[in-house]
């Protein structure tokens, strides 16, 4: 019998000027970017938390503390690679990931395939094992007021042992 684990993740960051907007490792043209200690890639952060949560390994703040200068401006895809290594070392592999990005603007549909390609390359899975959807918050809440962008992710891990 195959063992599986499921984890979920969430992240939100504030939109500010003079920062790049990076989602799923893709630089998205926009006048605002996300504020954070690293590159503030909320999608990748939510996926990392989902992977860690599936194995009861805590959250990304435990491994990459926001007050630690070594993570300042860090490329979240490199952090994801480290989390993926933890998953593999424990005898698990990614079955699939499903995620949602909540942003009023910019329109993200043109960038979803590139995000899927970047994430699947890091996680060593086929692109069709990574689901990414984008939606608005219908002008409600911080995302709807364009104060921030958030992402939700669910990860299914399959035992390779």
Swiss-Prot record:
Family according to the record: Belongs to the IspF family.
In the UniProt record, what gene is named as encoding this protein?
ispF
Q: How is the cofactor bound, as the UniProt entry phrases it?
A: Binds 1 divalent metal cation per subunit.
Signal sequence bounds: none
**NCBIfam families assigned:** ispF (TIGR00151)
Q: What does this protein do?
A: Involved in the biosynthesis of isopentenyl diphosphate (IPP) and dimethylallyl diphosphate (DMAPP), two major building blocks of isoprenoid compounds. Catalyzes the conversion of 4-diphosphocytidyl-2-C-methyl-D-erythritol 2-phosphate (CDP-ME2P) to 2-C-methyl-D-erythritol 2,4-cyclodiphosphate (ME-CPP) with a corresponding release of cytidine 5-monophosphate (CMP).
Which organism does this sequence originate in?
Answer: Cyanothece sp. (strain PCC 7425 / ATCC 29141)
Q: How does it assemble?
A: Homotrimer.
> Can you name one GO molecular function term for this protein?
metal ion binding
Q: Name the UniProt key words of this record, in alphabetical order.
A: Isoprene biosynthesis, Lyase, Metal-binding
Q: Which GO terms describe its biological process?
A: isopentenyl diphosphate biosynthetic process, methylerythritol 4-phosphate pathway; terpenoid biosynthetic process
Which amino acid positions bind a divalent metal cation, per UniProt? 11, 13, 45
What's the protein here called? Answer: 2-C-methyl-D-erythritol 2,4-cyclodiphosphate synthase
The entry marks the following residues as binding 4-CDP-2-C-methyl-D-erythritol 2-phosphate, namely 11-13, 37-38, 59-61, 135-138, 145
Concerning Gene3D superfamilies, the annotation shows: 2-C-methyl-D-erythritol 2,4-cyclodiphosphate synthase
What is its pathway?
Isoprenoid biosynthesis; isopentenyl diphosphate biosynthesis via DXP pathway; isopentenyl diphosphate from 1-deoxy-D-xylulose 5-phosphate: step 4/6
Annotated site residues (Transition state stabilizer) in this chain: 37, 136
Q: What reactions does this protein catalyze?
A: 4-CDP-2-C-methyl-D-erythritol 2-phosphate = 2-C-methyl-D-erythritol 2,4-cyclic diphosphate + CMP
Q: Does the keyword Lyase apply?
A: yes
EC no.? 4.6.1.12
């Amino acid at each position: 019998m195959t063992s599986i684990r499921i984890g979920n993740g969430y992240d939100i960051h504030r939109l500010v000027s003079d920062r790049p907007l990076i989602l799923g490792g893709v630089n998205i043209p926009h006048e605002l970017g996300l504020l954070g200690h690293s590159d503030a890639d909320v999608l990748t952060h939510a996926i990392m938390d989902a992977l860690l949560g599936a194995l009861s390994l805590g959250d990304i703040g435990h491994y990459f503390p926001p007050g630690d200068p070594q993570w300042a401006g860090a490329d979240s895809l490199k952090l994801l690679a480290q989390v993926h290594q933890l998953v593999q070392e424990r005898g698990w592999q990614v079955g699939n990931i499903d995620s949602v990005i909540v942003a009023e603007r910019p329109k993200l549909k043109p960038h979803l395939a590139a995000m899927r390609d970047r994430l699947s390359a890091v996680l060593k899975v086929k692109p069709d094992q990574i689901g990414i959807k984008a939606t608005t918050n219908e002008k409600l809440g911080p995302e709807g007021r364009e104060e921030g962008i958030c992402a939700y992710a669910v990860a299914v891990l399959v035992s390779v042992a």
